[in-house]
């Protein structure tokens, strides 16, 4: 839980020295550090502010028993995504050209796709941030 200063207790902050090479380097680092201790890895982007706890819980449940689950939105798939430990070796092979999306769309892999309109909304610009005030129409179609 976050305290008044915004510090999350019970969590360890990990710095990725190779951050400039892309998100795949952060996923690889997480797999290296968590492979023994964690059954699942959640990939959630900090700017996906509309994704709910219930949606994340659904992904975790759908990825149980060695599976994987990801959001489906706007005709594509992507984060948030949950990968079970069995996927860690594949995640360790990711690079800038072959990211996690390639794994999620591989027909040989079993991936549960959870419809998640909220995952399609992220904040990439000041305009995106300003549109958050009208986000209910995006999510609920009002």
Features from the language model and the residues they span:
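Nucleotide and nucleotide-moiety/phosphate-recognizing core
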Residues: 1-77, 85, 109-116, 140
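Activation segment
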Residues: 38, 52, 91-92, 133
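A generic structural signal for short hydrophobic patches within well-formed alpha-helices
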Residues: 56, 87-91, 129
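Short glycine- and hydrophobic/aromatic-rich loop-to-beta-strand nucleating segment
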Residues: 79-83, 121-123
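Conserved alpha/beta core of the MobA/IspD/sugar-nucleotide pyrophosphorylase nucleotidyltransferase superfamily
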Residues: 93-142
């Amino acid at each position: 839980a976050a305290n008044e200063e915004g510090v999350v207790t019970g969590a360890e902050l990990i710095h990725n020295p190779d951050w400039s090479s892309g998100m795949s380097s952060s996923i690889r680092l997480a797999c290296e550090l968590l492979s023994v201790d964690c059954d699942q890895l959640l990939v959630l982007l900090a700017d996906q502010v509309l994704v709910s706890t219930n949606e994340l819980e659904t992904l975790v449940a759908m990825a149980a028993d060695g599976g994987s689950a990801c959001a489906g939105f706007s005709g594509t798939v992507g984060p948030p995504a949950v990968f079970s430990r069995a996927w860690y070796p594949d995640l360790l092979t990711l690079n800038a050209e072959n990211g996690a999306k390639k794994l999620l769309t591989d027909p040989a892999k079993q991936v549960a796709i959870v419809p998640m309109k909220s995952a399609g909304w992220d904040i990439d610009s000041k305009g995106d941030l300003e549109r958050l005030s009208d986000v209910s129409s995006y999510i609920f179609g009002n």
